[in-house]
Amino acid sequence: MLYLGVIGYPIKHSVSPAMHNAALQHEGIEGIYLAFEVKPDRLRDAVFGAKALGFRGLNVTIPFKESVVEFVELEGEAAKIKTVNTIDLVEMVGYNTDVYGVKAALSGTELGGKTALVVGAGGAGKAAALALLDMGSTVIVANRTEEKGREAVEMLRRYGECIFWPLSRVEELKGKVDVVVNATPLGMRGFKAEIPVPPSMLDGVELVFDTVYNPMETPLIREAKKRGCKVVYGIEMLVHQGAKAFEIWTGIEPDVGVMREAALRALRF
């Protein structure tokens, strides 16, 4: 029996169990994927408790993607941005499949030479920024707290052209960016139903990508559509990062279509 799970706080919004359980069933693997709400002061207990119980792997979501790095060895992109969203509990290795998820979600868009604004400098923000740098974009990271934003940029600038911009002055970038990415929880079910930038900033922007997937139609996505921007839904990043995590745990490339359909079904309820 294969035991997998996701830890976060809050976690009720997660559709990862529906998505991964559908993949397990489709591949004929006897296993189960469960969601666990973990209080911030119990992270270590949760990780090592899952290992002790024989879990093969965990996904890690808000607010643990950065704090969990102290418990695992870092591999690939996780080592570059000190952010983990997938753990192999047998080897105690942390991976970042969010970077892969962002690249797959944005694969239909030519991003070389574009200027992208990433709002948020946490785990999702650093993953989105690294993906965009790898795809040839210049990246501006805007964050509410300057120290955290500058720390992220210091980490990212060795992989491409990346600068910090205070979120309080983000309106000054109007007309200067081609892509806007929300990598904050704003708009997520259970968080404030707001958008991370002034609506007028979206005028003339080519592409808007919201990493939030629940609800699918976030306030930012709705505003971007109204203003004629191409939009990419967070569900695409979710599905592709999940597929890569599944492959790490099982050695099998799952059917992305099966995972997407299961995630969409779960979002409707």
From Swiss-Prot:
It catalyses: shikimate + NADP(+) = 3-dehydroshikimate + NADPH + H(+). Pathway: Metabolic intermediate biosynthesis; chorismate biosynthesis; chorismate from D-erythrose 4-phosphate and phosphoenolpyruvate: step 4/7. NADP(+) binds at residues 120-124, 143-148, 211, 234. Its EC number is 1.1.1.25. Shikimate binds at residues 14-16, 61, 85, 98, 213. Pfam families: SDH_C, Shikimate_DH, Shikimate_dh_N. GO terms for biological process: amino acid biosynthetic process; aromatic amino acid family biosynthetic process; chorismate biosynthetic process; shikimate metabolic process. Keywords: Amino-acid biosynthesis, Aromatic amino acid biosynthesis, NADP, Oxidoreductase. GO terms for molecular function: NADP binding; shikimate 3-dehydrogenase (NADP+) activity. It comes from the Archaea. The active site is at residue 65. InterPro entries: Aminoacid_DH-like_N_sf, NAD(P)-bd_dom_sf, SDH_C, Shikimate_DH, Shikimate_DH-bd_N, Shikimate_DH_fam, Shikm_DH/Glu-tRNA_Rdtase. Homodimer. PANTHER family: BIFUNCTIONAL 3-DEHYDROQUINATE DEHYDRATASE_SHIKIMATE DEHYDROGENASE, CHLOROPLASTIC, SHIKIMATE DEHYDROGENASE. Belongs to the shikimate dehydrogenase family. Involved in the biosynthesis of the chorismate, which leads to the biosynthesis of aromatic amino acids. Catalyzes the reversible NADPH linked reduction of 3-dehydroshikimate (DHSA) to yield shikimate (SA). This is Shikimate dehydrogenase (NADP(+)). It comes from Archaeoglobus fulgidus (strain ATCC 49558 / DSM 4304 / JCM 9628 / NBRC 100126 / VC-16). The gene is aroE.
